Every structure is written in C-alpha cells, then in structure tokens.
Amino acid sequence: MWDLKSEWWAVGFGLLLLLAASAQAGGLAPHHYTPDWPSLDSRPLPRWFDEAKFGLFVHWGVYSVPAWGSEWFWWHWQGEQSSAYVRFMKENYPPGFSYADFAPQFTARFFHPEEWADLFQAAGAKYVVLTAKHHEGFTNWPSAVSWNWNSKDVGPHRDLVGELGAAVRKRNIRYGLYHSLFEWFHPLYLLDKKNGLKTQHFVSTKTMPELYDLVNRYKPDLIWSDGEWECPDSYWNSTEFLAWLYNESPVKDQVVVNDRWGQNCSCRHGGYYNCEDKYRPHSLPDHKWEMCTSVDKASWGYRRDMSMSTIVDENEIIEELVQTISLGGNYLLNIGPNKDGVIVPIFQERLLAVGKWLQINGEAIYASKPWRVQSERNKTVVWYTTKDSAVYATFLHWPEDGVVNLQSPKMTSATKITMLGMEGELHWTQDPLEGVLITLPQLPPGTFPVESAWTLKLTKVN
C-alpha cells in the first residue's frame, strides 16, 4: 500500500545523503568544532592550500610613506625611540610632525589592481595575502571601528582590500588577508595591558569586530594572523572566533588559517604552522607548514633606502622554493609596494623570474607531495617531490661532467627519465656504488629553458 509518510521519509533521507556527499566533494565533511584547541586542531586542512604551494605576500600601509628602516617605523621611532629613527625624523620632517601626518601621503595613486593581479599570475602564485591591517592599526578597508584611520577615510580614499581581492579572483588566485591582533599604540590595548589583561576592551571593540567584518565582507580563503605574542589566546578570544569561522562563517569549508593566535600557539595550534618568520626546518615536519620570506631581506614593507645587497638573488629564491616544497611546506614570498601603489622594477623582476621557472618546472611543484627521501647530496644537491606515481629530482647546480648521480631512486627496466622543458628521454645507467648515472643534455650556453634548478622526471621507479 502506498504510504505518503514513508515516501517523504525516503526523499528526505536521500536529500541528506546528497548534501553529505556534496559537502565531502567540496572539501570538508560537516563537523561541529568547539572553542578549544583539541577540537579546532582536529579540523583537516582544506586541500587547496597544500596543492597551491606558492603564494605572494604584500605588505602595504602607512609605513610605506616614510619608507625607511622597515614597516616597524612607528614603533622604532616613538616606541623604542631609536636614535637613528629620531634623527631621521628631525632631519626630514618639521617639528611636531606625527605618524598620523603620513597617512594623507599614502595615496595609492598608481595602484591598478588588474596590473598587480597580472603580475602575480605571471609569477605563478596560486594565492595572495595582503596586509589588511598591520601593527600600526591603519586598515586597508573601510572598517567601521577604525574611524579616520582607514584607506577610505584618509589617504587613497579607496577600499584596497576589496579592489585587489576582486582582481586576483578573476584569475582564479586564492585571496588571503593578513591581520594583526594587536596595535602598538591603541589606547584601549594599552589600557588592557595596564589592567593586567583582566579587561578586554580592545578585543571586544576593535580586534574581533574587524575580524568578523573581514570574513563576512571579503570572504577570504586564508587568514594570516599576527601580532599575538604579548597576550594569551584567552585574551584574544581566538578559539571562539575560530569555532565560528569553522562552523558558521561564509568560508567555513575552504578557509585556512595559520598558527599565530596567542602566546605559545605558534608551531602548536591553528591550521598550518609558520612557527617564526623565515622558518626553515631541516627535516620533514609532521604538520603542514609555510615559509614566509621577503625579496628585501631587511624589511617586509617598501624602503627607499634599500640596496641591491639586501635584495635576494633569483636563484636563491628558487632554491628556497624547491627546498620548501620538498619538505612539505608552502612558500610565501613578500614584496612591499610604495606609497603610490607601485611595485618597483626589481621586485617585479624577481617575481617574473620565479614565474618563468615555474612555467617549466611547476609540474614538480604544484599539487606535489614529499617523496620518501627529501634530498641527497652527491655532485650536486638534489631535492625530491612526487606526484601521480612520478618522482621529480630537482638539482641545484649543473655538474661539470654533465652527469647527475642519484642514490635514492630504485630503477626498473621500464624506468624513463626526462628533463622538464626538454624533449626526449635521457640516457641512464645503474652503478652498484654510485647509484643511477644520468647523462644530461649537451646544449650551447643560454639555450636551456631555465638557468638554474633543473628538474628530472622519473617514471616507473620502485
């Protein structure tokens, strides 16, 4: 006999199965996270982040106006009262000039987000992280809790966060936002510290409203938290925010976060680990991590006083990228635009060099996994990755005799070896002592597809 109740039950159950399958296909299965680290740390990292491998960091704010020393200019000048910074201000600015007086000069006059996005795409970046707010407290979007200290009210009179996000997403580049939890000189933060952190005036009226606003307004794929180190996560209400982010926010299924959410959180809690600036482990970690570094070794923000001696060589960038990916990390490379929104030519040159290398060798980078052996050193340093049953061996220096020897791969009679960017198979032999000996192509100088870090692809190896 036909039963209406049974039929509706069957339809409802089928819809639930369909929704569950859909959620799993999109990344993460439905799960409720509680505001504590054991629960939050159990959340799987969305797959896109590990597959992306290479991102770009952009430090841009009012500190781009004095553009001297580093993006910590305000703190060094009026927090530490460094003699060098005090002297710089005395020699270049009139008496009574305040840090806030720099803001109108932060014009972003030549900021063309489409051009930036084109550059980032040409660099091979799969995600971009912009400083929405650094420790100075100036927000690069029209924050309601940062009156007259944001990019809409003063300076550019533009929503910098929104404009760049729209441009990069047109190119299928993931968009992340850096946000500093603390601010050096905010009166409410100083009051909370004076009260021994027994009050949370700053958190409730500034930090948390900003974070919720950023997520709801821009729906970032990544939140790069910083400025956490002076206070425990209980002061910042970090676990409550992350539980909301993972359970209820509009980006709950795809958002990725780092580990800077309070004292003692770094390298212990959160999504992936930064551990420290320019962190570089010596062996394969058991947790997903990211190395963040800067083209200008002495600063994250733009400096008028930078010199070529502080600019990282393109070969060094590529070597760091290769090493980082082989050890299971992501590589986040920083540049600092100037106050007018110009990415200076030397920074563009470095980014385009990375992009050129990735056009040839990206197969060994994007969506790869660490191999059972991460590196070896014989005639040259070799770093390994693997993907789709192939093994990739990237060697950093061309051997003088034109022969690369690999100790780790176990060859079979069906093994084939090619070089990315070159046609044809390479000749190889197996030696019981030296391992696999691979004869490299003999071509005139300047005719190789890349000038450093060449990648061998090995198929059908044990």
Curated annotation (Swiss-Prot):
Highest taxon in the source lineage: Eukaryota
Q: Which reaction does it catalyse?
A: an alpha-L-fucoside + H2O = L-fucose + an alcohol; a neolactoside IV(2)-alpha-Fuc-nLc4Cer(d18:1(4E)) + H2O = a neolactoside nLc4Cer(d18:1(4E)) + L-fucose; a neolactoside IV(2)-alpha-Fuc-nLc4Cer(d18:0) + H2O = a neolactoside nLc4Cer(d18:0) + L-fucose
**Example GO molecular function:** fucosidase activity
Q: Which residues are glycosylated?
A: 237, 264, 378
Assign the protein's first listed, main location to one coarse class: other
Keywords attached to this Swiss-Prot or TrEMBL record, sorted alphabetically, are:
Glycoprotein, Glycosidase, Hydrolase, Lipid metabolism, Lysosome, Signal
Q: Name one Pfam family in it.
A: Alpha_L_fucos
InterPro entries from the UniProt entry: FUC_metazoa-typ, Fucosidase_C, Glyco_hydro_29, Glyco_hydro_29_CS, Glyco_hydro_b, Glycoside_hydrolase_SF
Question: SUPFAM superfamilies, per this entry?
Answer: (Trans)glycosidases
Can you list the GO cellular component terms from the UniProt entry?
A: lysosome
Position of the signal peptide: 1-28
Classification via PROSITE patterns: ALPHA_L_FUCOSIDASE
- Name the family the entry cites: Belongs to the glycosyl hydrolase 29 family.
Matching PANTHER family: ALPHA-L-FUCOSIDASE, TISSUE ALPHA-L-FUCOSIDASE
Q: What's this chain's function?
A: Alpha-L-fucosidase is responsible for hydrolyzing the alpha-1,6-linked fucose joined to the reducing-end N-acetylglucosamine of the carbohydrate moieties of glycoproteins.
Q: How does it assemble?
A: Homotetramer.
What name is this protein filed under?
Tissue alpha-L-fucosidase
Q: What organism is recorded for this protein?
A: Rattus norvegicus
- Tell me the classification of the organism that encodes this protein: Eukaryota, Metazoa, Chordata, Craniata, Vertebrata
